[in-house]
Amino acid sequence: MESTKFKEAIMNTQTITLGFLLFAIVMFAWEKIPLWVTAMIVAVGLTLTNILEPKDAFAGFTDSNVLLFMAMFIIGAAFFETGMAQRVGGLVTKFAKTERQLIAAVMIITGLMSGILSNTGTAAVLIPVLIGISQSTKFPKSKILLPLVFAAAMGGNLSLIGAPGNMIAQSGLETIGESFGFFEYAKIGLPILIVGIIFFVTIGFKLLPDNAANEDADSIYSQEKSYDDIPEWKGWVSLIVLIFTVLAMVFEKKIGIKLFVSAWIGALVLVVTRVISSSDAIKSIDMNTILLYVGSLALASALKETGTGDLIANTIVSKLGDNPSPTALMIIIFIICAVLTNFMSNTATTALMVPISISISQAIGADPRAVLMATVIGGSMAYATPIGMPANTMVYNIGGYKFNDYVKAGLPLIIVCGIFALILLPIFFPFFPN
C-alpha cells in the first residue's frame, strides 16, 4: 500500500513538473510577458507546489555562472564606457570589411578560444568587444552576437575542457575504466564548427535578425556617446583587466582560482580604481538576464530531481524495442539530448543523460565511449532557445532578441550540424567497433 502511494506521489510530481515545462515552452514562444517573468513564475510555482524546496528553487542566485555574469557585465561595461571596446573594434574591422567576413572571423576566434577556455567564459569576454565592433561599423549587434554564442558552444567540443558536459562524460567513463583523449572531441567538434561557420556566412546569414528597434534603450550599449572627456588611462586599465581576466580563466586549473572569482577580482579592481563608478557598475548588471537564468535553473533542477527528465528519455528509448539498431539508437539518443538541452541547459542535460547512456551501452553491449560521444555532442546543440546555455542568456537582452529569433536561427543550425554529426559519429565512434 505504501509502495503504491509512493509511486503515485512520484507520478504526481512528474506530472506537475511536465506541466511547468509545457507552460514555460508556450510562454517563451508566445512572449506576451518578459521571459524572466515566465522563468520566475516557474520557480515560484515549483516552490508553492512543493516540487522544490525554496532554497533549491532559488539556488541559481548563488550559481557560479550567475556570479560570472554579474562580474563580466561590470568588466564589459568598463571596457565599453571608456571607449576601449570601440578602439579594439575599429582595429578588428580593418580586417573584416563586411558583416559576413566579420561573422566568419568572430566564429573562428570564438570557437578556437572555447577549446582552451570555457565556452561561457569565452563568450563573456568577447561580448563587449563585439559590441564595440558593432558601434564602430554600425553592423547590428543582433547579427553578430548569436553567431558568437553559437560558435562558443561549438568550440566547446574541441577539447576535454571546452565545456562542463565534456568533463561530466569523462567522469562517467572513468567509473567504468574508460576515458576520452584531450582533443578526441575535436574529431566531431571541429567539423561541426567549420559547418556552422559556413552556414552563417551563407544561407544562415539571412536568418540572423536585425533587432536594432528591439534593443533596450536604457542599456549603456544602446546609447551613442563621446569618449573625448574620458582619461586615456581608464581605457588602458580596462583592457589590461580584461586581458588578465582571460589569462586567469585560461590557467584556472593551474592557479586554482574559479572563473567567477577571477572575473570578480577584475570587476573590483575597475571599481576601486574608479575606472567605472560603483553606481555605473550596479547599473551594468542586467537583471533580465540574471532572473531568466535563475528561473530556468529551477526548472532544470525540477526535471532532474523529480526524475521527469529520466522519464522522458527512458520512455522514448523503450519505444525502440529490445534489439534496436545501432543507427536508430544513436539518432534517438542524439535527438533526446538536443531537445532536452534547449530547456534544461547543456550541462544539466549531460549530467542527466550520462548515467542513462552508460546503462544503455552496457545493456546492449555497445562501446560506452561511442554512446557518450553522441550524448555530449547532442547535448551541445543548445542553439534554439535563450536558456539552452549561459551565453545564450547573456546576449538575450543586449541583442534585443525575441525567443523566436533563437528558434529561427538556431533550429536550422541544429538540423544542419546534427546531420553532419550523425554522419561522423559512426565513422569515428562506432557503437560496435570491430
Name every feature range the model reports, one short phrase each:
Residues I16, T137-F150, G156-I168, G172-D228, ...:
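Juxtamembrane and boundary regions of transmembrane helices in multi-pass small-molecule transporters
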Residues I176-S179, I358-R369, N434:
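Helix-coil boundary and interhelical linker segments in multi-pass alpha-helical membrane proteins
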Residues A39, M70, M107, L148-V149, ...:
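Residue-level recognition of transmembrane alpha-helices
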Residues V37-V42, N119-L126, L146-P147, L158-G162, ...:
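Hydrophobic alpha-helical membrane segments of integral membrane proteins
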Residues E2-M70, I74, K187-N314, M330, ...:
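Hydrophobic transmembrane alpha-helices of multi-pass small-molecule transporters
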Residues P54, R100, K141, F182, ...:
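Alpha-helix N-cap/start motif
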Residues A24-I33, I109-S118, V149-I161, A248-K254, ...:
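Transmembrane alpha-helix interface/packing and boundary motifs in multi-pass membrane proteins
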Residues V44, L48-P140, S284-T289, Y293-I364:
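Membrane-embedded alpha-helical segments and adjacent helix-loop junctions characteristic
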